[in-house]
């Protein structure tokens, strides 16, 4: 088909699986995928998975070694920022969902995959099985939920799981709003995967 695609594999790293870091990196290189990503494991706000984020630091040398296994064909990428954050975001307001909504396999539209569970039904924006996504996006429910997540009534450090996919957007927007690091227009080449699905 001669399509321009990028192939990657991911490892969701829990401390008890540290012995799998190097084999994972070697597998990515052996398969010849474009990248192998090693990222932290998100836990919910109750710590249901029991992830001990303090133990990630003990794996830094292994993660460095894994990155060095990459070559010109396969990049081994460690999501250092999230791993080093030890499960706690620097922000309390959750601004990221306005830029990166998530949709479940059932069609449920929510601000984050962390909110797909029925216990978060008040944060369910709609379901595109029943209505057009455009209508969901323009709905009062959308804005009510987005405004709530960005308000002092919501605390991202205690009221949701750890470091969701919207983490980087929320961090950048929080620093911009606080004036600690302003978001600047990009002048470089557009990044790959701007329309990642």
Name these PLM-found stretches.
Residues 1-131:
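Radical SAM enzyme [4Fe-4S]-AdoMet core and its adjacent flexible, acidic
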């Amino acid at each position: 088909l001669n399509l321009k695609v990028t192939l990657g594999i991911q490892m969701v790293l829990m401390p008890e699986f540290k012995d799998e870091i190097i084999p994972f990196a070697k597998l990515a290189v052996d398969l010849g995928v474009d990248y192998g990503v090693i990222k932290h494991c998100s836990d919910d706000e109750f710590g249901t998975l029991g992830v001990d984020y303090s133990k990630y630091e003990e794996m830094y040398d292994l993660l460095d070694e894994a990155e060095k296994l990459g070559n010109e064909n396969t990049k081994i990428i460690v999501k250092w920022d999230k791993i080093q954050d030890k499960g706690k975001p620097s922000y309390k307001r959750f601004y990221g969902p306005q830029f990166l909504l998530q949709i479940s396999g059932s069609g449920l539209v929510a601000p984050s995959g962390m909110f797909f569970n029925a216990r978060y039904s008040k944060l369910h924006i709609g379901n595109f099985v029943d209505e057009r996504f455009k209508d969901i996006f323009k709905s009062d429910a959308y804005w009510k939920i987005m405004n709530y997540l960005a308000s002092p009534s919501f605390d991202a450090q205690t009221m949701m799981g750890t470091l969701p996919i919207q983490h980087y957007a929320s961090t950048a927007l929080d620093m911009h709003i606080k004036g600690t690091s302003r978001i600047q227009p990009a002048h470089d080449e557009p990044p790959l995967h701007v329309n990642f699905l």
